[in-house]
């Protein structure tokens, strides 16, 4: 989908450029170009008898992410195994997740490894639904067709769902749990999206360092009667 952009970026680099690995998708009309190695062919070159080098310490580096520059100049951030593990386990607890959930990946992997939700699915034996194009119709279709129960996204995603046209929407029976972060969602957006079948939890963290370490765990007995502005502020 972004092959031409990647090729142009590599051509504009000084020195040795990264190796491009294609992930073709015939169903989405993105066949292999034949100019680069494909992901499956790359895996086939691996040694099945290779002995893994497991980390000796939980503070060892796990991943290198590059931020999008939303809170400053783009920068590379290293995440350690301990941090990713704690974030993953914390989400499972706060979302009260059970075995075999269905999660839709909307947050990019370069944002704290997709808020570490990527590793949450193998832990629970769940299904990871990937959304190639972040549009209202694509999200509604995934929820209705794949029975998605969880996803995370910025308030712009919530606005997209609230303002979707009738022909972009789909009916679904389950309540979808949503984490939102990046900016405070508008009170009107929160009110409207709850009526559509989404239960939104506001979270806060730093893309540059860790993830959504602070969550607003809703207490309906204390705040259930609050008006829209107060609910949004909480």
What residue ranges belong to the model's regions?
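Conserved pre-ATP/AMP-binding loop-to-beta segment of ANL
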Residues: 21-22, 34-66, 73, 96-102, ...
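Structural core segment of the AMP-binding/adenylate-forming
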Residues: 1-41, 147
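Hydrophobic/aromatic ligand-binding patch that stacks against planar heteroaromatic rings
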Residues: 9, 66, 120-122, 142, ...
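Conserved structural elements of the adenylate-forming
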Residues: 44-49, 58, 63, 77-98, ...
